[in-house]
């Protein structure tokens, strides 16, 4: 039997022993060494050749990833590691660190119970490290720390042992500060990482060695030995004495929870149903014999097998041919194949039980975040939707070069929207022009060149990138009337800014649009009061839609109940296209103050009420001192002091604001923010300005008001582009 076949056999037998399973992710800032680390773990576990590890980047198996040298998608793999005399099954997900692909990280967090946070010893904590840690802790995923690229501190920066220790202490303190700040209440103080207990390891993923205090005690290697090996440039021998996979996977097994332990506190966090019900108990206890329930965390397109769903099972088991229910879209599907991931390959297995991550084919309708369960299980509500911290801020229009490719292009776009819920796709079959909104230039480029051009073979024309703006109100409008086309129905609205606490809670995912479908009015009211809304107003909330709220302030209007859905529909249409530039509104509170309806239902149908509400709400917003908001990016630049002036000049030319500066040695770190609209082509420009000597990264920083002097011009440009009147 080949080594690989033996590995598959081990994986299958270990799937049933829950205390020997670990579902883990590796997450970090871009280029801090996640994929190199993953490769060496695989090599240690016998999955790929040791000589190739680190160069092979087995989990970057997409051509686009290999070419760019970065991880774009989250890759999955299962492997076996011997620890404390017992074999353990480790399901590993390697996630991207580039800010444009953060959506993949968010979805991967739903599938795992523990995370190895990788921090580069040279750069320290970076913005994306903080973002991925926040996502992990929000999903109650326990972190451990690996400080990578330690050899560079010795060989390049020539730090003394004392400076080395100080650098490590600073990184550990910074990580713990973030963990303490963002941990769920019950884990404050318990989840901090600690050198002495072995929840921190140091090493070099590229040179394949690592060390932790427990491993030092076991092997009698000292820190002085490590310094000597690095300075003598003999890291190969060090890798034999302290192999990366042994140190790291021991740390994973010792410090990260198995699925039975993790699901006890993770299920109440992601599922708001009755935990005492049969399905509730089965999920909390990770029961393989209970009803089947799981969540699709990722959709992968395969040329031969079609859509493959990566699924984390919380209870029950899935066999080939099982019928499944897709809860959110109320559809049925059949699991045509059940497999485990081995990097780019999938290996078929007879069945997969609770607590594991598997690959399913046959779930054509499923999208990332979908809840799956057995057909006779009532899993209500479905799992909490997977919320992501950033928003799509750049849009491009695309058209097929050949009209015969149009149907194919529409299929591909629908598939992309299912695979990646951070992409917004608007399909216009009449004009043939379709809009894709993504997280940044690179995100859009990968979608248009790779997913549409390379994978689907559709040639497309891509328009100039357009920035996504928002509209918001800064004052309170008078009472504004909306009349139906037949003049028999009148509704009166007031628009004003939404309370900041409510808007922030919506951004953080504490209240969601779908709460109004899933929860009782009383539950919604309690939740709104908890986050700081006035109880009188909380009672009267009709709906929340994309960060805007509609309240019913009327009393005793008989026909209002039957008109309710139409009023909500009209409100949604109005805030989807604001009055200034037909951009989405955000942070607007609209109050329905009064309404007069025709007593005959035939005269107050959808064709009458929706336009009445739409014009009334839009006019109220227009009279509440409406202004434009633009998306902002936080920009972090680390540059040698000689080039600091050039880097700052490049930022100020792009309406950038310097927020903070820190100096360490001859390197300066600049923290700043700049509008997305000014950041096109920044990558090339900043490399030119600093002769390629700087490191830089960006992350989404929310929306801010457009400067008053620039607003008229921007509004005019948007309206012209959309074919609206500009006078």
UniProtKB/Swiss-Prot annotation:
Residue sites binding GTP per the record: 28-35, 94-98, 148-151
Protein location: Cytoplasm
Source organism, top-level taxon: Archaea
Record GO cellular component, one term: ribonucleoprotein complex
All copies of domain tr-type G, residue ranges: 19-260
Its biological purpose: Catalyzes the GTP-dependent ribosomal translocation step during translation elongation. During this step, the ribosome changes from the pre-translocational (PRE) to the post-translocational (POST) state as the newly formed A-site-bound peptidyl-tRNA and P-site-bound deacylated tRNA move to the P and E sites, respectively. Catalyzes the coordinated movement of the two tRNA molecules, the mRNA and conformational changes in the ribosome.
Family: Belongs to the TRAFAC class translation factor GTPase superfamily. Classic translation factor GTPase family. EF-G/EF-2 subfamily.
Name this polypeptide is given: Elongation factor 2
Annotated organism of origin: Methanococcus aeolicus (strain ATCC BAA-1280 / DSM 17508 / OCM 812 / Nankai-3)
Gene, per the UniProt record: fusA
């Amino acid at each position: 039997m080949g080594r690989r076949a033996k590995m598959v056999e081990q994986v299958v037998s270990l799937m049933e022993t829950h205390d020997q399973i670990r579902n883990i992710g590796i997450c970090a800032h871009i280029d801090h060494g996640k994929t190199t680390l993953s490769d060496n773990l695989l090599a240690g576990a016998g999955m790929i050749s040791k000589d190739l590890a680190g160069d092979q980047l087995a989990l970057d198996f997409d051509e686009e990833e290999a070419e760019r040298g970065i991880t774009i998608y989250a890759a999955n793999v299962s492997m076996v590691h011997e620890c404390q005399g017992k074999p353990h099954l480790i399901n590993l997900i390697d996630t991207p660190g580039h800010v444009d692909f953060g959506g993949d990280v968010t979805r991967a967090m739903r599938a795992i119970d523990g995370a190895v946070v990788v921090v580069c010893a040279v750069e320290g904590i970076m913005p994306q490290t903080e973002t991925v840690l926040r996502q992990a802790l929000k999903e109650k995923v326990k972190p451990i720390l690996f400080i990578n690229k330690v050899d560079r501190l010795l060989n390049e920066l020539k730090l003394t042992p004392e400076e080395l220790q100080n650098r490590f202490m600073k990184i550990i303190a910074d990580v713990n500060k973030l963990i303490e700040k963002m941990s769920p209440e019950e884990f404050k103080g318990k989840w901090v990482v600690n050198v002495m207990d072995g929840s921190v390891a140091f090493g070099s993923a590229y040179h394949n060695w690592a060390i932790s205090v427990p491993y030092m005690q076991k092997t009698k290697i000292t820190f002085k030995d490590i310094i000597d090996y690095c300075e003598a440039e003999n890291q190969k021998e060090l890798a034999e004495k302290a192999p990366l996979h042994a140190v790291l996977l021991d740390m994973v097994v010792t410090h990260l929870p198995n699925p039975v332990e993790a699901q006890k506190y993770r299920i109440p966090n992601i599922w708001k149903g009755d935990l005492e019900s049969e399905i509730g108990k089965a999920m909390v206890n990770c029961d393989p014999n209970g009803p089947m329930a799981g969540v699709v965390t990722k959709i992968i397109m395969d040329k031969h097998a079609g859509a493959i769903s990566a699924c984390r099972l919380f209870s029950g088991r899935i066999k080939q041919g099982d019928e499944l229910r897709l809860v959110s879209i109320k559809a049925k599907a059949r699991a045509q194949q059940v497999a485990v991931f081995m990097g780019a390959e999938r290996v078929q297995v007879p069945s997969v039980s609770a607590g594991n991550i598997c690959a399913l084919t046959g779930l054509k309708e499923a999208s990332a975040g979908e809840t799956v369960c057995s057909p006779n299980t009532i899993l209500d509500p479905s799992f909490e939707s997977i919320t992501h911290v950033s928003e799509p801020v750049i849009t491009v229009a695309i058209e097929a070069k050949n009209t015969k490719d149009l149907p194919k292009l529409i299929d591909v776009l629908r598939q992309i929207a299912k695979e990646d819920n951070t992409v917004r796709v608007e399909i216009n079959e009449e004009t043939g022009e379709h809009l894709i909104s993504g997280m940044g230039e690179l995100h859009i480029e990968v979608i248009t060149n790779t997913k549409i051009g390379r994978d689907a073979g559709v040639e497309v024309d891509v328009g100039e990138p357009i920035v996504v703006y928002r509209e918001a109100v800064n004052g309170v409008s008078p009472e504004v009337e909306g009349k139906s086309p037949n003049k028999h129905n009148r509704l009166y609205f007031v628009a004003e800014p939404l309370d900041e606490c409510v808007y922030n809670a919506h951004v953080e995912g504490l209240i969601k649009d779908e709460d109004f479908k899933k929860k009782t009015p009383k539950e919604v009211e309690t939740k709104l009061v908890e986050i700081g809304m006035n109880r009188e107003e909380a009672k009267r909330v009709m709906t929340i839609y994309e960060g805007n709220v509609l309240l019913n302030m009327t009393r005793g209007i008989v026909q209002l109940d039957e008109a309710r859905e139409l009023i909500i529909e009209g409100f949604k249409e109005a805030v989807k296209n604001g009055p200034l530039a037909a951009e989405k509104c955000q942070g607007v509170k609209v109050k329905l103050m009064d309404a007069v309806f025709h007593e005959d239902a035939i005269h107050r149908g959808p064709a009458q009420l929706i336009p009445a509400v739409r014009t009334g709400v839009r006019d109220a917003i227009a009279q509440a001192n409406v202004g434009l908001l633009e998306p902002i990016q936080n920009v972090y630049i680390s540059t040698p002091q000689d080039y600091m002036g050039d880097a700052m000049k490049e930022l100020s030319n792009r309406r950038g604001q310097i927020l903070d500066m820190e100096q360490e040695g001859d390197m300066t770190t600049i923290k700043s923010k700049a509008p997305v609209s000014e950041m096109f082509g920044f990558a090339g420009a900043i490399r030119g300005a600093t002769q390629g000597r700087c490191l830089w990264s960006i992350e989404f920083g929310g929306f801010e008001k457009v400067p008053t002097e620039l607003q008229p011009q921007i509004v005019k440009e948007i309206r012209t582009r959309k074919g609206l009147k500009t006078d």
